Curated annotation (Swiss-Prot):
Signal in keyword set: yes
Domain spans labelled PE: 70-126
Places the protein is found: Secreted; Secreted, Cell wall; Host nucleus; Host nucleus, Host nucleolus
Alphabetized UniProt keyword annotations: Cell wall, Host mitochondrion, Host nucleus, Secreted, Signal, Virulence
Subunit record text: Interacts with host Toll-like receptor 4 (TLR4). Interacts with host cell nucleolin.
Signal sequence region: 1-23
Residue runs in coiled coils: none
Cellular component annotations (GO), alphabetically ordered: extracellular region; host cell mitochondrion; host cell nucleolus
Motif (BH3-like 1): 73-78
Motif (BH3-like 2): 134-139
UniProt name for this protein: PE family protein PE6
UniProt lineage: Bacteria, Bacillati, Actinomycetota, Actinomycetes, Mycobacteriales
Length: 171
């Protein structure tokens, strides 16, 4: 996996860095991209979900609860690594805080939309009440339309007999 070096190495403990990535005299570890071996990158990395012939829902339910990555380990035991790790950790905490605020706003917004939709539906029902009183309930109209359709189908099949059954369906 090729990456921009320091981002992955900043999350690794110094002992987990492979020998080719350790600083050599005259070369900076952060100056070049490097291939990093697979393994945990941060202190709060989650394990992989179980794989197999399980349906996706059960795979999701077996997955451990999400932990937010707000703490990054220093790549080495020097001031620069500690400062970079602290900066990235602070950024992660701010991001987590903003994410929680956005989730709360989204929840309130969705709730307000649902309340607005409910009040709009009740206002529409109230405004439509005189029309329903004049024309009758929608269920009665639906039954009448179905009876007319059935009569038309029977009339198309047997024109003489269809008229006898139509009067039985009226209400």
């Amino acid at each position: 996996m090729r990456s921009m070096g320091f981002l992955h190495r900043a999350c690794r403990a110094p002992s987990s860095l492979p020998a080719p990535l350790m600083a050599r005299p005259g070369r900076s570890v952060l100056a070049r991209p490097a291939a990093t071996p697979p393994g945990p990158l941060c202190a709060t990395t989650r394990p992989r979900p179980p794989q197999g012939n399980q349906p996706p829902a059960s795979r999701i339910s077996n997955f451990p609860p999400k932990r937010h990555k707000t703490r990054v380990l220093a790549a080495a035991e020097d001031e620069v690594s500690a400062a970079v790790a602290a900066l990235i950790s602070a950024h992660g905490r701010r991001h987590h805080s903003l994410n929680n605020q956005a989730a709360a706003f989204h929840g309130q917004f969705a709730q307000n939309l649902n309340v607005g939709a409910g009040s709009c539906a009740s206002a529409e029902t109230t405004a439509d009440a005189p029309t329903q009183a004049l024309l009758g309930p929608a269920d009665r109209q639906r039954r009448q339309r179905r009876a007319v359709r059935q009569w038309l189908v029977r009339w198309a099949a047997h024109p003489g007999r269809a008229t006898r059954g139509f009067h039985n369906h009226r209400q």
